[in-house]
Each structure stands twice: as structure tokens, then as C-alpha cells.
């Protein structure tokens, strides 16, 4: 009979979970449900079973834990990093040759590990130290048993049986005392080393840290110290010597028993020949090579570049773009000129040579060799801010051409100038009155460029210089003012060479890029290799430059190559060795800095000469001190070309031949090739139509002559002040004829007089001499007809008359005054001024 179970299910038996250990079923944990454990006895039985089970698995747990700890200890047993000794800093040339190195902090020459080792050294090292290097995993059992046998048979330790890996471990652990215990540790660590490093890496670690005698550590340092060459150039004799030397490094010193070292080397060479690694002839020749004598000094071709890399990059080894052979030649030039400059107590100089295409440095002379610590030999002048002198003028000239403020031949004023108290002077003193802009650049005249900067605006110039790559303009434009063009700002040789190279790069690429501009062409120089990439799509380049156009740059460089070269007496073009170079010099105020920078389509060369402490010296000028170095350096460079004319950015324009401006209606006309921007430049302001009598002796006007009696002639008329100085250098200049006596006196803009001093409303500081007397002030005026008489008045009081030479020395009392000048024809000129007394 079927009976219904109220629970619905039969109760399941309570069975513990079990695991099988060593073929035994061991309960681990029963189903722990509070409803199934109903008594204290059951709880006790459960706890007891757990204790018994733990006792049974304890040995296994200990074994597993110990093994895990051992594996972890083995995995982490090598020190991190493996070697922590200080490393020498090294700079290499483009080909990997050593340029300069700095000794490590612990006084050792210890170079960074090399990427690859020469085969002569690898073969020699493995044959001498560890023939089974490539077959073992850190321990060579055969070598160990051989060492035990030899040591027992000799009764002393003659072989350690150490592999190269074990020696690397020993060096990494500080070369601890050798004993059996240390050997065991080294063996264990050597196996771990083999697991973590490739065979090549282990060889590199050994070669970089092995002792080679004295304070020389590592193969590369030893190769340079003992043989004066890169490890890649080692002979078999040299490689074998360096393989055996770490075994007895003290034998390298002169005076020691060097025959032992020679014998070791030759035995190794014989072994190499016996194994067929070298042929017998090579072996005999190698054994005939003598041991090195006194250590060679390490190359010190670019110590300042090494210092700069250390500060800027922090790299232990850096391959630069410098070419060691060319660097050595330029260093010789620096040394030779430094010896001459020392006679004038000029102690420092710097030279940069760079490739234009990539902007990569080829030579880096940060200071004169042997200048001495007292004279700042350690200062890297290439990056040191110095007064620019007039070295920035080509940039202003190019920018002014670019913005149509001038054209290449347009005239700029060269007269005494006083702009809000700023009174620039030309280096050679004197005035031209008016001078073509390109001539002002080639002669480096100061006053015309101050006036040009006034027209361009010093704030704009400040902004453009920073865009071109000048990094030293730390002050606002107002801080520099118009002095920005004459050395009022500091710059450095690195920035300047980069800026000139960028201009050359733009002009060089313009025809190659289908008359387009790549903004990436403006960039600073680099002492590390760069990757020059041609634009993939020339059509996407800019049609217009946002900095300097090709036409403006070409015109600038054309003007710069007209500079007279030092010592050449203007005949340098006749020499077959001459080359076309656009170059500029500069001299700072007080003769503290002399600059010279030259550029061709291929190279830029920059030179600075002076004293690191800023002391000025007579004769410290760009053309005398820096330019000769510039052209000596160019003499070492390969032949150079010249820039192709950027015809697509040039245009033939009608130019006034006498003033260089666009021809006006009264000008004669020349058709000249000028930058396209010149089409927007000013029309000639100096040619005007004048009315003359029939004899062309006098000027006349409709007020006094019938039009039928007048002749109309175009005439070149300069302002009286400019004319005054222009006539002194240009006797062919024809001044305006005087006004006819029957005609009324003209005034205003037609006045034939113009004050030279004082100009505008000015304050005149008059010094008081030691005896208490006031110094006299010299007033000066320019007149178109120098022979006329001029009557001088101060505050309506007549003080005298001048004729031909219109200067007057007078000592007005302190205060405000009015100077009135009247010539014999009735022309009148007034100027207010103020006298302020100042003690000397």
C-alpha cells in the first residue's frame, strides 16, 4: 500500500567532502549546515579530523613552500641593476668615433657598454677565458674538473674554472674574496645570469666592466687609452692583449715585468693560430707588434658639446652629427687664431659649422682650446648670450623688403639723428646723407638701419626675430627700443646660425618645391642626427611665406656677398680659391663682442671672438677678429654653389636709377629685377618738377615770371640736411639753383635750411667744467647754398653771422630758448630747445 511521506523527500546522509592524498581519502570539510550538526560531539569530531588532516599534509606543504621560496630567491637573486658603478659620459661623432669623454664620478674611465664588440676581441676572449662559452649555461663542468685537477696536481690554486658568466657575476658583486663559498654563489648566480641575458649581452657586460689597469675599466676605454683608437680598429695583437690583460691588469704599467704580459699575449695568439682562427702569417705579424707604452690621452675634440649634452639630454653616450676629421681641422684654425688674439689680450672664441639642408652641426668649438680656466675656458660661448652688435641687420633688411618698406636700392637717410634722446652713430663715424639700402647693409651703417627699424617698428621686429628662432629676447619690445638693431639685445651663436641656415634652406628649396614654401624649413640647428623628409605633396605647401619670401632672402644674400673681405683690398673675386658667400660681421658697443657669420646653399659658419668675462679690447671688431677665422673655416669646406634666383618671386620693375624707389613721373627709368613685394613700395619722393628761368640759373615761379618765360625741368631734390652730407660724397650732385631775386621768398617745405643740431624740440645737457665754467654748445645748420650768409638769433637777440661753414658755438643760460636763423634771401627757420646744466 502506498504511503505518503510528509517531507516529500528522503533525508540524504551527511557525507564529508573528501580528497585523495597518497591513495587515502581524507575528509576536508563536511557540508556545514547548522541544521545538520546538532551536537557538540559532532563539532568536536569535525575539529579533530581537521587537525589530523593537517598533520598528514604538513610535509608536502613545507616542501612546496620551500621550493617556491627557493624559486623566488633564485629569480630575484641578481642585483638590479647588475652594475651600479658611475659611468663616464661619452659623445661620438657621426661615424661613431670618440669625440670627448668625461671621467666617471669615482675617478675611473668606465665607458657605457658597447652595442657590439669587435670579432678579434671576442675570439681572443673566448679562447683565453671560456672556450665553452656558447655551450654551457653559466657553469662549465669540464672546466671545473680541469681546475680541480690542476690545483691538486700543483698543490696550489692555478685555475679557478670560472666561466665568463661567473666573472661577470663576480665583478657585479664587487670582486669579493675568492673562496669555495663565494665560488658556489657565483656559480648559482651565473646560471641565473644565463637565463636572463643573451650570450651577446653577457659578453658586452664583461667587456664594459673588466679591469684593464690603473683607472681604466672596460674594453672601449682601454682601447682608447692604450692604443688611441676605437675598438673596431683593433688588430689581432691588440685584441689578444686586451683579452689577457684583465687577468693581470697591473702588468700593463711601464716598469713592471711586461715580458710576462707579452708572453701571455703571444701564447694566446699561438692558440688562436692552432685552432685555425687566424693563419700563421697573421699570428707571426701580430706577435711582432710591441706592447703599448704610456697611455694615450683620450680625445678631447668637443668638450663643450659633451657638457651641453650632459645638461640637456643626460645621456651617457650620444652619437652626434659632428664630423671628427672636420672638427679637428676647425679646432686647429681656432688654436692658430687664438695664439694671435692672445697678443691683444683676447682670450676666447667660438665656432659653429652646420649643414644647411638638415641643420645638423658639423663642427662645434665652444671655446678656444688652451684659453685657461682663469679666462673662462670652460664656458660654452656658443650658447652664451652676448650683445648682438649689428649682426641682426640682414634680418631687418629682409623683413623690410618683404613688407615693401624698402626695395634693394632705395635710399635711406644717413644724417645725425636724435630720436627721443637716442643718438646712434656709424661705426666709422661721418655721414653719407642718403645711401642705398643694400649698400647700407653691405657697409653695415648704423644710422640708416635705425631709421629703417623706426619705419618697420621695433615691436614687429622683436616678434619676427622670435619667430625666426631667436630665443634670448626675454624682455618686452619697449625694453630694447630702437637699440634692438645695434646690439641692444643679447643673442647667441647657436640661434644666429640656425636663423641664417633657415633662410638659406627656404631659398634652396623654393625652386625644388615648385615655388612654394615649407614652414618646416625654419628650425634650429641640431647636434643629433635628424631625418629630413621631402614633402609628400608639394601642392599642399604654402604659396606665400609667413616669414621671409624667397625674393627677399635672395636680395638680402646678394647684398651680403658684397661685403669687403678682410685683407683682400676688394679684389677677392679675382682669386681662383674664392667662393660666393653671403656674410655679415658685427661688433658690440665697447668692443666686447666680434661676430662673423657666412652662409652658402650648403653650409653656415658662425664665429664669435671676445672675452668670456665681457672685457672689451681695442681692435675687437668683426672684420678684423672674426672674419679671418670665418674664411679660414670655409677654406676647409668642399666647394659650394650659389643660390638660384627665385624668378617666380621676382619681377622686373621700373626703378628710379638715382633713388632706387619705384619710378615716379619725373624720374628716368631703369628696368631692374626686384622682389615682387617691391611693386608695393614707395614711389620716388625726391624727383620733382622745378621752374627755371631761360638761363637755368634761378628758380622762378608764376608769382614773378610769365609761364612762357619759364623752363620746366625734373630735378633731384633732397632735404637740406640730407643734401648737406650727400654733396660731400657725391660732387656730381646738382643742387637746386637759388630763387630769382625778383621772386618772393618761399617758406615751409621749400626752405633751403635744415638744422643739424639741435633737431626738433630737444633738451641740451651742458657740462660744467672743473673751473665752474659752462661748456659751449655747437649749433649747426645745413643750407642748400653754402655760400649764403645766415644770421643767428637766440630769443630775438642777434648773436652772429656765418658763411660757408654754418656752425656757431654759444653758451646760452639755463632754461628754455628759441633759436632763429635767417639767410640773406629772407628764408627763416626756428627751433626751440632747453639748456640744462650738468656737473662733470
Where are these regions (language model features)?
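Acidic/histidine-enriched alpha-helical segments
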Residues: 140-146, 185, 220, 259-261, ...
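A penicillin-recognizing enzyme superfamily signal
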Residues: 320-343, 351-355, 364-367, 372-381, ...
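Residue-level preference for non-acidic, small/hydrophobic
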Residues: 96, 125, 168, 202, ...
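Short pre-catalytic segments that frame enzyme active sites
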Residues: 85, 90, 97-110, 221, ...
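Conserved catalytic neighborhood of penicillin-recognizing serine enzymes
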Residues: 153-178, 232, 295-310, 406-461, ...
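Soluble, non-transmembrane domains of envelope/secretory-pathway proteins that act on or interact
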Residues: 52, 278, 420, 536-542, ...
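Juxtamembrane regions of bacterial inner-membrane/periplasmic proteins
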Residues: 2-4, 9, 14-343, 356-362, ...
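Glycine-rich, acidic and aromatic/proline-enriched surface loops and short helix-turn segments
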Residues: 170, 174, 208-215, 232, ...
Amino acid at each position: 500500500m502506498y504511503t505518503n511521506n510528509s517531507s516529500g523527500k528522503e533525508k540524504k546522509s551527511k557525507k564529508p567532502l573528501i580528497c585523495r592524498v597518497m591513495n587515502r581519502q581524507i575528509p576536508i570539510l563536511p557540508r556545514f549546515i547548522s541544521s545538520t550538526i546538532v551536537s557538540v560531539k559532532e563539532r568536536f569530531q569535525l575539529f579533530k579530523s581537521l587537525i589530523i588532516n593537517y598533520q598528514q599534509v604538513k610535509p608536502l606543504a613545507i616542501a612546496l613552500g620551500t621550493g617556491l621560496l627557493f624559486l623566488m630567491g633564485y629569480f630575484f637573486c641578481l642585483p638590479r641593476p647588475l652594475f651600479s658603478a658611475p659611468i663616464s659620459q661619452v659623445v661620438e661623432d657621426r661615424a661613431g668615433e670618440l669625440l670627448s669623454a668625461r671621467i666617471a664620478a669615482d675617478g675611473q674611465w668606465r665607458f657605457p657598454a658597447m652595442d657590439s664588440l669587435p670579432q678579434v676581441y671576442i675570439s681572443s676572449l673566448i679562447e683565453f677565458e671560456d672556450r665553452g662559452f656558447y655551450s654551457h649555461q653559466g657553469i662549465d663542468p669540464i672546466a671545473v674538473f680541469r681546475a680541480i685537477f690542476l690545483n691538486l696536481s700543483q698543490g696550489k690554486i692555478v685555475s679557478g674554472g670560472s666561466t665568463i658568466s661567473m666573472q661577470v657575476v663576480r665583478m657585479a658583486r664587487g670582486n669579493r674574496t675568492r673562496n669555495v663559498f663565494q665560488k658556489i654563489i657565483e656559480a648559482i648566480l651565473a646560471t641565473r645570469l644565463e637565463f636572463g641575458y643573451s650570450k651577446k649581452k653577457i659578453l658586452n657586460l664583461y667587456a664594459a666592466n673588466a679591469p684593464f689597469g690603473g683607472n681604466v675599466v672596460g674594453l672601449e676605454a682601454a682601447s682608447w687609452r692604450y692604443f688611441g683608437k676605437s675598438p673596431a680598429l683593433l688588430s689581432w695583437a691588440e685584441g689578444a692583449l686586451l683579452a689577457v690583460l684583465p687577468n693581470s691588469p697591473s702588468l700593463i704599467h711601464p716598469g713592471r715585468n711586461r715580458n710576462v704580459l707579452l708572453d701571455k699575449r703571444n701564447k694566446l695568439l699561438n692558440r688562436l693560430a692552432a685552432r685555425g682562427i687566424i693563419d700563421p702569417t697573421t699570428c707571426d705579424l701580430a706577435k711582432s707588434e710591441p706592447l703599448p707604452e704610456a697611455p694615450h690621452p683620450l680625445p678631447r675634440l668637443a668638450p663643450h658639446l659633451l657638457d651641453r649634452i650632459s645638461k640637456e639630454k643626460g645621456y651617457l653616450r650620444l652619437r652626434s652629427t659632428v664630423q671628427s676629421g672636420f672638427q679637428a681641422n676647425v679646432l686647429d684654425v681656432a688654436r692658430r687664431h687664438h695664439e694671435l688674439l692672445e697678443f691683444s689680450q683676447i682670450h676666447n672664441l667660438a665656432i659653429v659649422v652646420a649643414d644647411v639642408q638638415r641643420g645638423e652641426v658639423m663642427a662645434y668649438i665652444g671655446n678656444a682650446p688652451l684659453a685657461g680656466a682663469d679666462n673662462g675656458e670652460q664656458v660654452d660661448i656658443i650658447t652664451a648670450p652676448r650683445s648682438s652688435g649689428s649682426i641682426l641687420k640682414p634680418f631687418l633688411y629682409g623683413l623690410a623688403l618683404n613688407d615693401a618698406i624698402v626695395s634693394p636700392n632705395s635710399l635711406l637717410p644717413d644724417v645725425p639723428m636724435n630720436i627721443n634722446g637716442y643718438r646712434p652713430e656709424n661705426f666709422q663715424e661721418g655721414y653719407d646723407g642718403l645711401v642705398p639700402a643694400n649698400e647700407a647693409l653691405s657697409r653695415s651703417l648704423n644710422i640708416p638701419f635705425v631709421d629703417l627699424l623706426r619705419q618697420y617698428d621695433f615691436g614687429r621686429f622683436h616678434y619676427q626675430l622670435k619667430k625666426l628662432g631667436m630665443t634670448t629676447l626675454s624682455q618686452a619690445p619697449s625694453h630694447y627700443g630702437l637699440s634692438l638693431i645695434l646690439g641692444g639685445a643679447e643673442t647667441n651663436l647657436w640661434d644666429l646660425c640656425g636663423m641664417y641656415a633657415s633662410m638659406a634652406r627656404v631659398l634652396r628649396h623654393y625652386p625644388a618645391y615648385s615655388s612654394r614654401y615649407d614652414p618646416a624649413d625654419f628650425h634650429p640647428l641640431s647636434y643629433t642626427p635628424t631625418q629630413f623628409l621631402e614633402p609628400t605633396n608639394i601642392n599642399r605647401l604654402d604659396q606665400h611665406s609667413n616669414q621671409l619670401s624667397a625674393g627677399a632672402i635672395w636680395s638680402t644674400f646678394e647684398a651680403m656677398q658684397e661685403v669687403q673681405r678682410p685683407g683682400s683690398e676688394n679684389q677677392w673675386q679675382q682669386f681662383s680659391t674664392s667662393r660666393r658667400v653671403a656674410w655679415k660681421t658685427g661688433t658690440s658697443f665697447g668692443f666686447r663682442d666680434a661676430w662673423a657669420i657666412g652662409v652658402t646653399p650648403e653650409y653656415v659658419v658662425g664665429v664669435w671672438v671676445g672675452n668670456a668675462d665681457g672685457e672689451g679690447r681695442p681692435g675687437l671688431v668683426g672684420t678684423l677678429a672674426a672674419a679671418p677665422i670665418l674664411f679660414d673655416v670655409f677654406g676647409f669646406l668642399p666647394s659650394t654653389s650659389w643660390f638660384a634666383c627665385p624668378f617666380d618671386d621676382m619681377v622686373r620693375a621700373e626703378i628710379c636709377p638715382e633713388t632706387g624707389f619705384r619710378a615716379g613721373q619725373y624720374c628716368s627709368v631703369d628696368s631692374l629685377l626686384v622682389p615682387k613685394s617691391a611693386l608695393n613700395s614707395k614711389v620716388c619722393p625726391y624727383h620733382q618738377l622745378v621752374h627755371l628761368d631761360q638761363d637755368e640759373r634761378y628758380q622762378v615761379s608764376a608769382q614773378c615770371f610769365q609761364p612762357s618765360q619759364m623752363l620746366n625741368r625734373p630735378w633731384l631734390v633732397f632735404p637740406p640736411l640730407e643734401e648737406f652730407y650727400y654733396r660731400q660724397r657725391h660732387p656730381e650732385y646738382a643742387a637746386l639753383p637759388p630763387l630769382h631775386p625778383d621772386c618772393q621768398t618761399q617758406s615751409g617745405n621749400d626752405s633751403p635750411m635744415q638744422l643739424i643740431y639741435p633737431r626738433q624740440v630737444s633738451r641740451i645737457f651742458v657740462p660744467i667744467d672743473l673751473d665752474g665754467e659752462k661748456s659751449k654748445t655747437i649749433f649747426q645748420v645745413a643750407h642748400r647754398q653754402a655760400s649764403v650768409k645766415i644770421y643767428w638769433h637766440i630769443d630775438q637777440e642777434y648773436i652772429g653771422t656765418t658763411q660757408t661753414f654754418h656752425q656757431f658755438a654759444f653758451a646760452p643760460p639755463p632754461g628754455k630758448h628759441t633759436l632763429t636763423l635767417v639767410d640773406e634771401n629772407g628764408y627763416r627757420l626756428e627751433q626751440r630747445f632747453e639748456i640744462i646744466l650738468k656737473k662733470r
